[in-house]
Amino acid sequence: MVQTVYKNSDQTVFEDAKALFQLNKNILLKGPTGSGKTKLAETLSNVMKLPMHQVNCSVDLDTESLLGFKTIHTNEEGHQEIVFIDGPVIKAMKEGHILYIDEINMAKPETLPILNGVLDYRRQLTNPYTGEVIKAAPGFNVIAAINEGYVGTLPMNEALKNRFIVIEVDYIDGDILKTVIKEQSKLQDEQLIQHIVKFNEDLRTMTKQGQISEEAASIRALIDLSDLATVMPIERAVQRTIIDKLEDEREQQAILNAIELNF
């Protein structure tokens, strides 16, 4: 399978992220859902040839989800013993890999201070379950992603935010979007791809005007739309991938109007 890479007409987005990575700075990718933040992190992982350990944040995220947990293990002699299973944070630190924290502002603020020492010059933490002091191996880097203003998100603690350098990641469009659709979906029909790109421009305009939510204009939704367009009429593909996800009837009607204009 061909490895897809992050693309953006603003080349400084990736160039700056790579430069910050090489300086061992914590990177906070900030942008709307589906704008390619995870793809950018994955591309950095591939370019730097470092594996990536991912944490998916939610209100249910706890210290065990970050650091790991104790469990009972049967050793080679057949005796049971209590062992600690490393979680993504500790794995990344010990191996000198990348730690990617997705939707970091979905986590409860009281869950994240355990990472303060990981994110500052110390690059270390004390495992509260074992007492072990863990210092990050060379190569360890932290990338986090944030979606601001969405349901379920919480204001990011200023002390935590100050440990990162922010890079804005906006939606892609135009020729770059055409290339992404061709590379990441099954759709290869140039004319239909052009119509989808124009349709996306209308969605983004409506998003900026507050007529529809940003989720409706996500790159992820467009890739799904393009895939479905190879097996069903484009109108039904839009219905399945975008319209049916929306609760507001006015948003649904606005997108139906955009379909009539573009297809």
From Swiss-Prot:
Q: Does this entry carry the keyword Nuclease?
A: no
* Top-level taxonomic group: Bacteria
UniProt-listed Gene3D superfamilies: P-loop containing nucleotide triphosphate hydrolases
Upper classification of the source organism reads:
Bacteria, Bacillati, Bacillota, Bacilli, Bacillales
Q: Which GO terms describe its molecular function?
A: ATP binding; ATP hydrolysis activity
Entry keywords, A to Z? ATP-binding, Nucleotide-binding
Identify the SMART domains for this entry. AAA
Q: What is this protein called?
A: Uncharacterized protein SE_1092
The residues listed in the UniProt record as binding ATP, with positions renumbered to this chain, are G31, P32, T33, G34, S35, G36, K37, T38
Pfam families for the chain: AAA_5 (PF07728), CbbQ_C (PF08406)
- In which family does this protein belong, per the annotation? Belongs to the CbbQ/NirQ/NorQ/GpvN family.
Q: Which SUPFAM superfamilies match?
A: P-loop containing nucleoside triphosphate hydrolases
InterPro entries (alphabetical): AAA+_ATPase, ATPase_dyneun-rel_AAA, CbbQ/NirQ/NorQ/GpvN, CbbQ_C, ClpA/B, P-loop_NTPase
The keyword ATP-binding appears for this protein:
yes
